[in-house]
A protein has these predicted regions:
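Active-site neighborhoods and metal-handling regions in enzymes and metal-associated proteins
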Residues: 1-219
Length: 219
């Protein structure tokens, strides 16, 4: 929908915010938004918790990046998802930095780790590809998410900050590495992941790993 309608140059951050909510409300189980939608085009995408309004709403320009972070409260769960969308043809720098963020996202999602591991011990997996280029992001990699409860819910989290909370089966956490070039663009890729026992069906290995855990991507 964005690719089709952005070519006119008239599509705005607020247009997208309102259209996304209308799509969401077509579902039978939707009860409302889980947080105000973050809808940032170009430099506004580099503001991690940007809140669009009538005065700040920018048009989606060609050859830029558009970041949208949204979620809903449903009878059977709570969602929080971020996508970064190329409008037109992104620059080579944008492509490379997006790829580094995506590599970190995938590496964390595929992690296999022993019981009693905390989120802070896994955080480096999401950042290492960015660190190779001297880049980083200033927010946590993941926060706990409730089920038809709070979209930010502890005690589990994944971040550089020391955290002794063990990841346990059933915990749901966001996986959201990013990169932000102030005044230019923002990149974030976010799915929700659940901590599971490392069974062969989830890891792709020949047998279960009895003393290990892994993640299942829910989004």
């Amino acid at each position: 929908w964005i690719q089709k309608n952005s070519k006119s140059g008239q599509l705005t951050e607020l247009n997208v915010t309102n259209k996304l909510e209308s799509f969401r409300r077509e579902g039978e189980k939707i009860q409302g938004l889980s947080f105000p939608t973050i809808s940032g085009s170009g430099p506004n995408g580099a503001i991690v918790h940007y809140k669009v309004n009538e005065r700040s709403s920018k048009k989606l320009k060609q050859n830029s990046l558009f970041l949208v972070d949204s979620g809903g409260q449903y009878i059977d769960g709570t969602t929080d998802v971020t996508r970064t969308i190329a409008v037109g043809n992104p620059t080579q720098e944008m492509k490379e930095n997006f790829t580094r963020v995506l590599k970190g996202h995938i590496t964390l999602a595929k992690a296999i780790f022993p019981y009693k591991t905390s989120g802070s011990q896994l955080d480096v997996l999401a950042r290492s590809s960015l660190w190779e280029k001297g880049l980083d992001y200033d927010h946590g990699t993941g926060h706990g998410v409730g089920s038809y409860l709070s979209v930010h819910e502890g005690p589990q989290r994944i971040s550089k900050m020391p955290n002794n909370v063990e990841l346990k089966p059933g915990m749901v956490i966001s996986n959201e590495p990013g990169y932000y070039e102030a005044g230019k663009y923002g990149i974030r890729i976010e799915n929700l992941i659940a901590v599971r026992k490392a069974t062969s069906s989830l890891t792709g290995l020949e047998s279960d790993l009895n003393n290990f855990l892994c993640f299942e991507t829910l989004t």
